[in-house]
UniProtKB/Swiss-Prot annotation:
Protein location: Cytoplasm
InterPro entries: DapD_Trfase_Hexpep_rpt_fam (IPR005664), Hexapep (IPR001451), Hexapep_transf_CS (IPR018357), THP_succinylTrfase_dom1 (IPR023180), THP_succinylTrfase_N_sf (IPR037133), Trimer_LpxA-like_sf (IPR011004)
EC category: transferase
EC number: 2.3.1.117
Name of the featured protein: 2,3,4,5-tetrahydropyridine-2,6-dicarboxylate N-succinyltransferase
Single GO term (MF): 2,3,4,5-tetrahydropyridine-2,6-dicarboxylate N-succinyltransferase activity
Subunit structure, as described in the record: Homotrimer.
Location, primary (coarse class): cytoplasm
Organism per entry: Shigella boydii serotype 4 (strain Sb227)
Keyword hit for Transcription regulation: no
Gene Ontology terms: cellular component: cytoplasm
Keywords recorded for this protein, A-Z: Acyltransferase, Amino-acid biosynthesis, Cytoplasm, Diaminopimelate biosynthesis, Lysine biosynthesis, Repeat, Transferase
Binding site for substrate: 104, 141
Substrates-to-products reaction catalysed: (S)-2,3,4,5-tetrahydrodipicolinate + succinyl-CoA + H2O = (S)-2-succinylamino-6-oxoheptanedioate + CoA
Length: 274
């Protein structure tokens, strides 16, 4: 694995010179191997180690290099044709392979090669980009988007129209992460490497980036870049220092534990916010 990483790191330093016509065999094979390992879930761009999320930057570099070494090609699918550098994940799947891997894909959901989809996942008409990792038991609802290299945990619900930001465009240092047992409400956006910690509930229409103030109304604390575990979050506003205007923020209205979540439905958690 170290040799593979060294090849990727070296090639990335001269990425501006690499084109589909001049990419050398060693680099091409290394990039293709990494994409295959990401596709199978054997590797992932980010993982939790000793309680902390660690981003493997060299894997992200391999994803970026794949756009340098591959030319556009005609892609068949959904009774249409496409023209892109990245093949579709399910292009060569037959019924036996779908049965073996154990997830559902509703047309016209699109998943790029290099994204991992775990067992018991349901993909409604949605989009999952290269390098993403979607863990077991997750629902990606209609028109939801899982961005490049984003990490989605177990038993997550991404509601209709949710956007989970990627790292490729614009280039971000770390992927956006939604931990296990989270609910992301319809049309919400979580981007720029924000981490939504385990068991959190994000209401409909909440937008969170690195500069978004995440205000805990019980403690008065303001968080940036992460939603603490077990938070129930709605959209809100905070006043300016001079009191002349207010600016958007996300508000943590309560904290819940797994026991409470097990007894109370998601809708009930969001309705009783006073």
């Amino acid at each position: 694995m170290q040799q593979l990483q060294n090849i990727i790191e070296t090639a990335f330093e001269r990425r501006a010179e690499i084109t589909p016509t001049n990419a050398d065999t060693v680099t091409r094979e290394a990039v293709n191997q990494v994409i295959a390992l990401l596709d199978s879930g054997a590797l992932r761009v980010a993982e939790k180690i000793d309680g902390q999320w660690v981003t493997h930057q060299w894997l992200k570099k391999a994803v970026l290099l794949s756009f340098r070494i591959n030319d556009n090609q005609v892609i068949e699918g959904a009774e249409s044709r496409y023209f892109d550098k990245v093949p579709m994940k399910f292009a060569d799947y037959d019924e036996a392979r779908f049965q073996k891997e154990g997830f559902r894909v509703v047309p016209p959901a699109a998943v790029r090669q290099g994204a991992f989809i775990a067992r018991n996942t349901v993909l409604m008409p949605s989009y999952v980009n290269i390098g993403a990792y979607v863990d077991e038991g997750t629902m990606v609802d209609t028109w939801a988007t899982v961005g490049s290299c984003a990490q989605i945990g177990k038993n997550v619900h991404l509601s209709g129209g949710v956007g989970i930001g990627g790292v490729l465009e614009p280039l971000q240092a770390n992927p956006t992460i939604i931990e296990d047992n989270c609910f992301i409400g319809a049309r919400s956006e979580v981007v720029e490497g924000v981490i939504v910690e385990e068991g959190s509930v994000i209401s409909m229409g909440v937008y969170i980036g690195q500069s978004t103030r995440i205000y805990d109304r019980e403690t008065g604390e303001i968080h940036y870049g992460h939603v603490p575990a077990g938070s129930v979050v709605v959209s809100g506003n905070l006043p300016s220092k001079d009191g002349k205007y207010s600016l958007y923020c996300a508000v943590i209205v309560k904290k819940v534990d797994a026991k409470t979540r097990g007894k109370v439905g998601i809708n009930e958690l969001l309705r009783t916010i006073d």
